């Protein structure tokens, strides 16, 4: 992943990539731990109102046990859970997001490469160095095709590494959101803090799902723009074959490169569920539809 297009990465583009990564990761961590804060706050409120501090269900203590050791165990279990969540966030969720963003910016770098190749080609044409411009364009096309082929090959590696994580996130977000929304709708005894706690959990689930699906959809969008970048590289303004290598047909190279770039690159989960912007909207709508169906039957 790191070595593909590394020679042609622009400092400004890499700074933008790092900024996007930081926004995604920090936004997700704030969302998740904001949700956790409401869970703890609700537990503390119950404790001071004469009920139990329960945020995690454990074997010990029993629900009726309200002694100091039992309360201590509940607090320790909550702290351990939050530390485990931090490791899961960094080792699974944010790692997946970072790789998707890196992959997206590789395609942006490739498009910039073809745009720079076009500028260099026409700069040589303006100076009257037609042969050198043709040779540089031919060599640049070959280099770009190799990088594009390597990038397409990386999609299968990303699926093998992170496909299960993204697929489970789609299922978890939809199923958990329906359950939590029904709990809010069908319960008449929820306090305001408890309602905020559950709603923040639902928002955290959909926020992570949106980060996965929207970043994956952005890969499809950026990959689709490579074909246009190749087509406008300037091949129309040069002879079909460079003099130094008459076996190399520039127009044939362009046709093959565009054919390769026009194949839709769509990230998938379970090898069938497309990870795109449309899928995110579909999951949100389906979740609400299932919730509305169960709620209507209950009423």
Predicted regions and their residues:
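Helix-loop-helix junctions within predominantly alpha-helical proteins
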Residues: 2-100, 105, 112-130, 179-207, ...
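Terminal membrane-anchoring module of integral membrane proteins
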Residues: 26-32, 120-123, 127-299
């Amino acid at each position: 992943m790191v070595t593909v297009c590394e020679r042609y990465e622009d400092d400004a583009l890499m700074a933008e990539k790092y900024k996007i990564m930081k926004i995604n990761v920090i936004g997700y961590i704030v969302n998740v731990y904001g949700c956790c804060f409401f869970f703890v706050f609700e537990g503390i409120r119950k404790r001071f109102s004469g009920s139990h501090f329960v945020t995690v269900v454990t074997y010990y203590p029993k629900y009726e046990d309200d002694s100091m050791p039992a309360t201590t165990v509940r607090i320790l279990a909550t702290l351990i859970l939050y530390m485990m969540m931090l490791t899961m966030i960094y080792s699974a969720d944010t790692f997946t997001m970072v790789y998707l963003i890196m992959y997206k910016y590789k395609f942006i770098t490739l498009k910039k490469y073809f745009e720079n190749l076009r500028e260099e080609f026409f700069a040589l044409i303006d100076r009257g160095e037609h042969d050198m411009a043709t040779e540089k364009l031919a060599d640049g096309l070959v280099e770009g095709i190799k990088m594009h082929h390597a990038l397409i090959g990386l999609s299968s590696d990303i699926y093998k590494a992170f496909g299960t994580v993204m697929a489970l996130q789609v299922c978890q977000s939809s199923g958990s959101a329906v359950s939590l929304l029904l709990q809010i709708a069908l319960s008449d005894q929820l306090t305001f803090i408890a309602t905020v706690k559950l709603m923040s959990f639902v928002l955290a689930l959909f926020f992570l799902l949106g980060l996965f699906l929207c970043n994956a959809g952005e890969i499809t969008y950026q990959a689709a723009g490579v074909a246009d970048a190749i087509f406008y590289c300037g091949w129309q303004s040069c002879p079909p074959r460079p003099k130094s290598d008459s076996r190399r047909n520039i127009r044939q190279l362009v046709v093959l490169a565009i054919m390769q770039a026009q194949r839709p690159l769509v990230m998938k989960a379970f090898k069938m569920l497309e990870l795109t912007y449309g899928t995110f909207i579909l999951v949100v709508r389906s979740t609400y539809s299932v919730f509305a169906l169960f709620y209507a039957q209950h009423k």
